Amino acid sequence: MKKEIASHLLEIGAVFLQPNDPFTWSSGMKSPIYCDNRLTLSYPKVRQAIAAGLEELIKEHFPTVEIIAGTATAGIAHAAWVSDRMDLPMCYVRSKAKGHGKGNQIEGKAEKGQKVVVVEDLISTGGSAITCVEALREAGCEVLGIVSIFTYELEAGKEKLEAANVASYSLSDYSALTEVAAEKGMIGQAETKKLQEWRKNPANEAWITA
């Protein structure tokens, strides 16, 4: 499953690998990878494979789920497709409460005591997913865990999720993606080394000249 999804993401250009010409994230950090899972919305077969995979993860790890919650905005569509497949209620969670109207942070009906699984498109440092989890917990929901399309497998993300006491499972990850990219001839040994070094310590830009 991990390599299949990784292959899909590479084929449609949802993931870009540029170890020799790094991207600069909004945080200022240099990165050899950029992920835009919103592109999956435009490819029916890919988004169907993702929805089926997320459903499988949820049934395996969180079988008692009662409602699906999407993170705004990238997780909303995938949460909708998964909830439809599973015939479950759905809501979505904003990064912060609206400044007008009812001031809702959670849109849709999430009731106190309901068992929720959060659907996220990408796990990097885990910040947006944890914000979603905290909002649901404050509303009295029981958050069973998070499922996502892809994770960078960053230690900072793992540590934050552990500190928040929330389980997280992804359809694909950085390791599988770099392996598939190498198998497809998209990157060579030198590029693979740079990608591996970045993964070990993203904050240290020594990987750029590795």
UniProtKB/Swiss-Prot annotation:
Give the protein's cofactors. Answer: Mg(2+)
Its Gene Ontology molecular function terms? magnesium ion binding; orotate phosphoribosyltransferase activity
Q: Which residues bind 5-phospho-alpha-D-ribose 1-diphosphate?
A: R94, K98, H100, E120, D121, L122, I123, S124, T125, G126, G127, S128
Q: In which residues is orotate bound?
A: S124
Q: Does the keyword Magnesium belong to this entry?
A: yes
- Identify the metabolic or biological route this protein is part of: Pyrimidine metabolism; UMP biosynthesis via de novo pathway; UMP from orotate: step 1/2
One Gene Ontology biological process? 'de novo' UMP biosynthetic process
Please tell me whether the keyword Glycoprotein is annotated for this protein: no
- EC number(s): the record gives 2.4.2.10
Which enzyme class, named as a word?
A: transferase
Which sequence ranges form a coiled-coil region, renumbered to this chain?
none
Instruction: Could you list this entry's UniProt keywords, alphabetically sorted.
Output: Glycosyltransferase, Magnesium, Pyrimidine biosynthesis, Transferase
Q: Which reaction does it catalyse?
A: orotidine 5'-phosphate + diphosphate = orotate + 5-phospho-alpha-D-ribose 1-diphosphate
Please state which protein family the record places this protein in.
Belongs to the purine/pyrimidine phosphoribosyltransferase family. PyrE subfamily.
Q: What does this protein do?
A: Catalyzes the transfer of a ribosyl phosphate group from 5-phosphoribose 1-diphosphate to orotate, leading to the formation of orotidine monophosphate (OMP).
| Complex formation | Homodimer.
* Protein name per its UniProtKB record: Orotate phosphoribosyltransferase
